[in-house]
Every structure is written in structure tokens, then in C-alpha cells.
Amino acid sequence: MTVIDLVRQFAEDARTGVLVTDTDFSAAGPKILYANPAIGPLTGHSHTSLIGRSPKALQGKATSPFTRKAMGEALRAGRGFHTCLTNYRADGEAYLCEIDIRPLRNDEGEVEAFIAFERAVERRRVRARPGKNTRYRPVDPATEDEAVNEFSDFRPFQSPLD
């Protein structure tokens, strides 16, 4: 059983978008090896049409170059990365996306692929607090209800953003 087969077993019917990419960090960027169906409503692309493309295809003018650079550095070093950034849907609409990327390592500890958990978030307007700008709340794109972390044991979104 391959890594993709294992991920497919738990992610195929998940409401959170899941991507698996290779580790090629050439100029074109890593290639998507697997995308679950939940990525479709999030990005406006069918999950099958994303296979073989780079996640960079979802980025655009308002995607922070600083965040892209920091993400690339972390992934090239074999570390995970968690952030909110602006991505773009197939129709060109910008949306705020929370992404939690983790390396998938083999028995020798080498990174074989990366898995990314993605979800749209909305800004919640609140009074600013020292050290905090804005709080974010995950949103289920199908219902606009507050999303529930389906991978609670794995906790891919546990961070100061929660």
C-alpha cells in the first residue's frame, strides 16, 4: 500500500481539503499527487484536475511573497508549515485559506511527500488584543457553518490561529 492509498483511505470523504505533493522544489514547484473531493468546493477546481499541477497554481497577486518564501524554506528543510494565505479559486475569486502542511517520512526519516490540510476561513472582526491582529474561524464552504476538525486526534490545525 502506498502513501497515497493510505491518505485516500481517511481523506476521501473528509470535509477538509487534503492535498499530497511530491518533494520537487524546482521553479515549477511540487506536483500534486493526490487531492480529495473536498478540495473542489474550496478551490473551484475538480479534485482530479489538480493532479500533476503545482499548488502554486492556486496562488496569485495577493498571495504574500513573504509567506510563500517562508513556506518554501520550511518545506525544503523538511519541516511542516502552518499559515493563512490568500489563494484563488478557478473563477479568480480570492479567498483566505488556512493551510497546515506536514512532511510524510519513510522509515529512514527521509521526506517522501508532503500532506496539506486546507480550509477557507473568514475574518472575525474583534477588538484587537496585544500581540494579536485578527482571529479566524474556519468555515465549511458547503454550509458556511463553523467547521469541526475532523482529524481531532491528528490535530493538523492546532496553533495560535485557533
Segments and roles (model prediction):
Residues G29-L33:
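Conserved hydrophobic beta-strand signature of PAS-family and PAS-like sensory domains
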Residues I99-F114, R119-R129:
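Short loop/turn elements at sensory-signaling interfaces that couple input to output
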